[in-house]
Design a protein with these regions (language model features):
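An acidic intrinsically disordered interaction segment
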Residues: 1-2, 73
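N-terminal module-boundary/linker segments of secreted carbohydrate-active enzymes
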Residues: 2-10
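Mature-region segments of soluble proteins
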Residues: 14, 18, 22, 30, ...
Length: 154
């Protein structure tokens, strides 16, 4: 992330990291979204337009206020159950923000080569110059269709 695209304060980045670690928490050998630097991916997305910058700043402020940020409390000091309840309340109160937060978290997470490797996908090799792409072999999706969900239902 370049300095020109910084739209979150250090406190907001820390809060965002904690929040996205609840959206995609670490499980077994899969890392949580916060530990992969997805907050920077989300900040880049938020910086793309002024309306998104406002949406994410207001949404993070809502989470901070609801968690008692600025006091001895705060999001990170809540139990996981309390964090999840707080995020559910934000989802109801500000669905546009929450939908974008989820979307950008998943976009950032599932485009990381480390995640591709851990879930068993091979990153395709680049085609040589001038080559035409082959049509999708839908049987390649069988592996995904047949596996158990590895995401957290909320």
């Amino acid at each position: 992330m370049s300095d020109a695209k910084q739209v979150f304060s250090p406190a907001q980045r820390s809060l965002l990291t904690g929040v996205i670690n609840r959206i995609i928490p670490p499980k077994d050998d899969m890392p949580g979204a916060g530990s992969l630097g997805i907050a920077a991916f989300i900040e880049d997305a938020a910086a793309s337009t002024t309306s998104w910058t406002r949406l994410f700043n207001e949404g993070l402020a809502q989470i901070a206020v609801a968690a008692g940020q600025g006091s001895d409390h705060g999001f990170e000091n809540l139990s996981n159950t309390a964090k999840d309840e707080l995020l559910r309340s934000i989802e109801v109160a500000n669905p546009v923000f929450f939908d974008q937060l989820i979307l950008q978290t998943y976009n950032g997470y599932y485009t990381k080569p480390e995640v591709f490797e851990l879930i068993g996908y091979e990153v395709p090799k680049p085609a040589p110059p001038g080559a035409y792409p082959e049509l999708l072999d839908v049987s390649l999706l069988d592996q995904q269709r047949n596996r158990k969900p590895f995401w957290k239902k909320v």
